[in-house]
């Protein structure tokens, strides 16, 4: 059980933690694509890192700044790091006009703190900070060293993590509170592919998809000839002369079954006209409503990681050049090499060229490792509910860290508007998560 002195400190310093999080939200730390002001991810991200390292240094921890890519704070630098806790201080952009309040000025409403980064991932970083403060204030010694890692580019490719790994080793046990409870222990592998072909289909322009990792909600096409297809138009398709459009439903590439792919819907309609041979071929490779890769011959599944998912996420035709994007999330029962070989063969058979742009192996930390079992025990102790490992199609900050897992801070069945408008974190959950982080540190590194 969490010592009373630790719980009391966390409870009595709750407002202080809220104030710290408010200050941290105040840094508009959207990582810049290019270095700015001599900082790799821009000045606001650097200022956010400086702010957190100042807090940790004042706590007596030994801090290292890895050239503003990542910061590290060691509890006891005379010992090798045993537990790594990985958070990030960069955030995704916010459209201020869509928010009820300024996304970079924290606001308390309805016992929640609103602001960009409240749940992803500044709130978790503050929870870890105050967990460490509570342990220190309670006079508790740790027999193993904790290294608190704070990155500045998780949202844009995790180059911060790559930079750190080029200069220092990762602790043998690592978790990130940049995911969901109870524990994310398995993340599917990913392939992102581009396919191309010079098409003879009578298309002036085809436009669909703006993100490679999302089911597109809209697709439109301008034709150079009258459409003579036999397919039923359906309510999703609108026609204005030689212009057609399909209205679908957006979804993340890791959960495509919750969407309605506008690309495949429009391809199926166009493919009913014999003049649109390439559209018909693509409709066969990506049957509308199919998300398991059957059309490409790659459907597979296993009990632990679930089924493969596959979407055509972007498709554009301009001056006769057809270019598209495919996002595939595959389970641990197959390999990226096997999937890529089959996909390229399927495209080649239809006359398309296909090349891989991103390749990532699955990430899997076995459920029965002592580290995972320790964290599950902490979750059960703190929440009173059964802890289970979960698998996801997306990726977390520890995807490329052997043995790493995501542990919090999102509770099941909560929508925190992460990456959306009015992102928030309930104040009560900030306190609960601080207790969770403290309990995890003490179980793994305590006496």
Regions found by a protein language model. Give the residues of each.
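Acidic/His- and Gly-rich active-site-bordering loop/insert found
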Residues: 2-113, 140-142
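Generic non-transmembrane alpha-helical segments
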Residues: 9-16, 20-27, 51, 55-59, ...
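Short connector loops/turns at beta-strand edges and beta->alpha or beta->beta junctions
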Residues: 26, 30, 104-106, 249, ...
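An extended, acidic, His-containing surface patch that forms the Zn2+-binding/catalytic region
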Residues: 56, 64, 256-311, 316-319, ...
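Active-site metal-coordination/substrate-binding segment of hydrolases
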Residues: 62, 81-150, 156, 421, ...
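Acidic-glycine-rich active-site phosphate/pyrophosphate-binding loop
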Residues: 94-108, 190-192, 196-197, 238-246, ...
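Midchain, well-structured core segments that form catalytic/ion-binding scaffolds
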Residues: 155, 161-331
